[in-house]
Regions:
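Active-site Asp-x-Gly
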Residues: 209-262
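Active-site acidic catalytic loop and adjacent metal/ATP-binding pocket
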Residues: 47-48, 54-59, 67-68, 96, ...
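Juxta-kinase regulatory segment immediately upstream of eukaryotic protein kinase catalytic domains
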Residues: 1-44
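ATP/Mg2+ or Mg2+-diphosphate-binding catalytic cores
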Residues: 16-18, 166-168, 172, 247, ...
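Generic structural marker for isolated residues within well-ordered, non-membrane alpha-helices
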Residues: 10, 32, 84, 133, ...
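An alpha-helical support segment within catalytic cores of ATP-dependent transferases
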Residues: 24-35, 138-200, 210-212
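A glycine-centered beta->alpha junction motif in the catalytic cores
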Residues: 61, 73, 89-90, 104-122, ...
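A conserved alpha-helical element in kinase catalytic cores
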Residues: 29, 51, 62-107, 111-135, ...
């Protein structure tokens, strides 16, 4: 692990969890060693790490390639374990090999070849996405599952909406556009007739190639109950600046057996969120223009 990698990870963790994350990060090598001795795996190199965790490659005692995921937020990790176990019958999420919420640790099988969906041939993707959704959505929501798509959107609109205070963003997206997205969202939520257990964060970076026998595998679920179209909307909106959202929407709706009108309506709801992300982190102007028109 290079110092630069750890510095970058440290900055992201501090951004998310506050200055205490630095002390936690310093203890990661010792924590990984303790868990390796307890669970019998061999620790490998640093794997890609997100804003809330550090991920290391490891080899399970039976030789299975695996990843060790560590987070200062044990409760968050426990929730992730629960969601992966709920979706396990679908065969379309990584298997949980071990977990300890108190230690903020879990070991998952590594998905191989593991190519992200955004790097797979675009022509076969709609069909494969359809197969993935069919498998995921066939899992019955647990009777007492507390998370709903409505709550997910309330949180997203509140959190992302704060960025409208940034002049660079308010110059492109006004309060009226944002309010229109909220109203469109309310209308779609009020007219949901089919409710399934959604992955809830199914963008092209959260779907990996599990090879010919397994198909596409979804990682990092934020499971909630709601309209099946929601698990295709990020993929559809990703058509902005390429073949176009409308064309991709038709293709994906057909391949996934979804209501094309509702899927397109959902894409208009999330379009301004994508614009804010592009303006914040950089994105093609052509896509921004198309998404602004979609949100109008």
């Amino acid at each position: 692990v290079t110092g630069v990698d750890m510095e970058d990870i440290g900055a992201r963790l501090v951004d998310r969890f506050g200055p205490g994350a630095e002390g936690w990060l310093a203890d990661v090598p010792a924590l990984a060693a303790r868990l390796a001795s307890r669970w019998g795996f061999v620790v490998g190199e640093l794997f890609e790490s997100g804003a809330s965790s550090v991920v290391l490659r490891c080899s399970w005692p039976d030789g299975t390639p695996a990843v060790l995921k560590l987070s200062p937020d044990g409760a968050l990790l426990a929730k992730q374990v629960e969601m992966l176990r709920v979706f396990a019958p679908s065969g379309r999420v990584p298997a949980v090999l071990a977990a300890d919420a108190d230690a903020g640790a879990m070991v998952l099988e590594e998905i191989l070849p593991g190519t992200a969906a955004e790097d797979l041939p675009p022509s076969s993707l709609p069909q494969r996405w359809g197969e993935l959704l069919t498998a995921l959505h066939s899992v019955a929501p647990p009777a007492d599952w507390p998370l709903r798509l409505r709550g997910r959107f309330e949180e997203s609109f509140a959190r992302i909406g704060k960025r409208l205070a940034d002049p660079a963003i308010s110059a492109r997206i006004g309060e009226d556009t944002w309010q229109r997205a909220i109203e469109r969202c309310e209308e779609l939520l009020d007219t949901q007739t089919t409710n399934v257990l959604l992955h809830g964060d199914l963008h092209l970076g959260n779907v990996l190639d599990g090879g010919a026998s397994r198909g596409l595998i979804a990682i990092d679920p934020k499971a909630c109950v709601g309209d099946p179209c929601f698990d295709a909307v990020d993929y559809v909106v990703g058509g902005a600046g390429y073949e176009g959202v409308e064309a991709r929407c038709r293709l994906v709706a057909d391949a996934c057996g979804l209501d094309g009108d509702r899927l397109y309506a959902w894409s208009r709801v999330v379009a301004p969120m994508f614009v804010i992300s592009f303006l914040t982190y950089g994105g093609p102007e052509q896509a921004i223009g198309e998404l602004l028109a979609l949100a109008s």
